């Protein structure tokens, strides 16, 4: 009986909070403030214009990734970020129900199909699930299903049963024999989907093995994560613990922590295994209570960067975290309000301070992301995956508010 009353109390609290949020949004619209959706519509229309200009100049890429100076940077389908822009358009279709976005999503997804047999990368989930995965979810086009199943089959060819993980990179062979990065956890969602669609347990077993091995070897006692773990492919033993995009091997690269939070939340959703939920909560606790976390909850690019507060932020880490927290709020009744309110606070900060001015930023929605500071690459710029998880967070927030 007490548990029933507790659940009712939580539901009432969330409902009250949601009603307040909806009333505030209506008030802002009446005052003439541009809604997040209207802002996104205008920005993407502008992005299409900028994309056409760059293509007309001879650029060969298929998808916008970022900006360099005053230039829109396009990438080939093999780039790990190639699926995010079409994913953004699928989310726009879902948010608006306007078939204009459906057609644009199809258009920008199409060139990525060839990646379904590209076995030299672990990024199949990012490229295929974010594009065709959303496309199949929203249209049930059987062609999209076939593309995804083939992609999942390609991805598991990189699995080493001795290590228990999917290999991340083939490059940097001089540093690692078998590197696995925390980002790789995000690609498991494609495998869980493939298992449900085909009933082939191989997909499930590979995903669970990778998640378990990563949980064992990637995380420190405080539940912060290393970026790269090097394995001996013959013995499965850990040989190195490093970073590639963070400040140092022992630092906490902000986006890496966000990948961990998001992916273990997803693993709990797909398996029902409580150890993944516990892992997600502990990672979330580390992120949200870190002394270097700014008040607006948009982290610096690394929680241990030496010149905080004079360090670049990483908006992409914030958007991934917000999206993950919205989902996590549906899984932990006793912390539902806390997680949702925290995600709401992140989104409020993004909308207030980190949203691009209309018809600027080459059409990207958000500013101030950091891709790879040690390599002096993509520092304090818009990056397409920040927009992707921002839109996903908007969708998840909308569903919770209903």
Describe the function of each predicted region.
Residues 22-402:
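Glycan-recognition and catalytic cores of secretory/periplasmic carbohydrate-active enzymes
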